[in-house]
Amino acid sequence: MLIYSSDPSDSHVAPYGGVSALMTPNPIAAGIPAQPWPILLDASTSITTAGLCERNHREGKRLPGKWLITPAGELSDDPAVFGPPQGGTILPVGGLDHGHKGYGLSLMVEALTQGLSGFGRPEKPTTWGAAVTVQVIRPEAFLPMEEFQAQVDWLVSACLNGEKRPGIAEIVVPGQREMIRRDEALR
C-alpha cells in the first residue's frame, strides 16, 4: 500500500532552484509484506519536516545540517529563518546537489493528491486540510503471492546481510526498528 499526503493550505518547500515556498514536505508512506519484518516507509519529500524546524526554533537548537534556504538563496541551519515572516524554506530531499529528485517526488505527491481530489492550491484554502491518495496494489493480480514474497524476502535478506561500511554495526530495513519496539512492547 502506498499513501501520499499534502496540505494545500500550507507551504514550506520551494521548487528546486527556487526560494519561494510552494509545497509542503509531502510525505510518502508505504507498507510491503516481507520477512522477518515488513518494509514500512514514512518519508518526507523534503530534507526535513516543518515540525522539526519549528521544534528546534522553540528549543533554541540549530538543525543538524544546512537544510534551509533563505529568501536571498543562502543555506542555513538556523530554524529562525524558517517560515513566515522570515520566508526561509526547506530544501527538497537531495539538497542543493540532487534536490531535483525530491522536487520531482514532491510534484508527484501534489499532483496525485490535489490533482485527483480536484481541490488544492488554486482554491487557496485557509484552513488545514490534507489531500490524500491511497494506492493499493494486489500482487496476486500479477503473479502468485509466493513468487512476489520470495522476491521481496530475498531483497530484504540481501540488504540485512550485505557487507557494511566501516563503523556501521547493522543494516536495517525501513520500519525494522519500530517493529522490534512494537514486539518488545507486546511481550
Each language-model region and where it sits:
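Conserved active-site and cofactor/substrate-binding residues in soluble primary-metabolism enzymes
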Residues: 25, 88, 100-107, 130, ...
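Short, ordered loop/turn segments at secondary-structure junctions
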Residues: 6-8, 176
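Catalytic-core signal marking the mid-to-C-terminal active-site face
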Residues: 111, 122-187
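Hydrophobic alpha-helical scaffolding
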Residues: 16, 98-101, 141-145
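Phosphate/diphosphate-binding glycine-rich loops and adjacent basic-rich segments that engage nucleotide
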Residues: 10-83
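Structured core elements
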Residues: 29-31, 40-42, 92, 134-136, ...
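Secondary-shell segments that build the walls of catalytic and ion/ligand-binding clefts
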Residues: 61-121
